[in-house]
Amino acid sequence: MEPLQITEEIQNWMHKAFQMAQDALNNGEVPVGCLMVYGNQVVGKGRNEVNETKNATQHAEMVAIDQVLDWCEMNSKKSTDVFENIVLYVTVEPCIMCAGALRLLKIPLVVYGCRNERFGGCGSVLNVSGDDIPDTGTKFKCIGGYQAEKAIELLKTFYKQENPNAPKSKVRKKE
């Protein structure tokens, strides 16, 4: 991970990603939000939708990828060309699954807020973004640390509350 040089552009896009994360929190989701920017235009945005959809793969990045594919179709753009020129702005380091998808799509740059110490795919757990992994797409650059404290506070807020979508405990009490 490279150190972050904060620019007005990064501040603008990350502010919008944090709005998506707040929306996720307001809707009972893990507060992660992201934007996929192509040619200074948002072509995909997402927030976690795992609980809403009952689909564990509906992370913010996956939702945004689907939107980019739709945008490409509506604008007669070749998705491979678009993905190769996208910058992803996301509030939390992409998980291993999402980092794998980003690598396969050849997204060149990811800017993120806080590290994902449990599932991070940009170096916190595995370095999917930068390791030599045969036949798995292209390495991509990760720049982290933008308002990491803010991202962590959003996550703490989520994990302090009751999750009505969590499965019931199957632990039996001894009698």
From Swiss-Prot:
Residues 8-133 form the CMP/dCMP-type deaminase domain. It is an enzyme of class 3 (hydrolase). The keyword Hydrolase applies. Transmembrane segments: none annotated. The active site is at E61 (proton donor). One of its GO terms (biological process) is tRNA wobble adenosine to inosine editing. Keywords: Hydrolase, Metal-binding, tRNA processing, Zinc. Its EC number is 3.5.4.33. One of its GO terms (cellular component) is nucleus. It holds the Pfam family MafB19-deam. Its cofactor is Zn(2+). Zn(2+) binds at H59, C95, C98. The keyword tRNA-binding does not apply. It catalyses: adenosine(34) in tRNA + H2O + H(+) = inosine(34) in tRNA + NH4(+). It comes from the Eukaryota. One of its GO terms (molecular function) is tRNA-specific adenosine-34 deaminase activity. Gene3D superfamilies: Cytidine Deaminase, domain 2. InterPro entries: APOBEC/CMP_deaminase_Zn-bd (IPR016192), CMP_dCMP_dom (IPR002125), Cytidine_deaminase-like (IPR016193), tRNA_aden_deaminase (IPR028883). Probably participates in deamination of adenosine-34 to inosine in many tRNAs. Belongs to the cytidine and deoxycytidylate deaminase family. ADAT2 subfamily. This is tRNA-specific adenosine deaminase 2. It comes from Xenopus laevis. The gene is adat2.
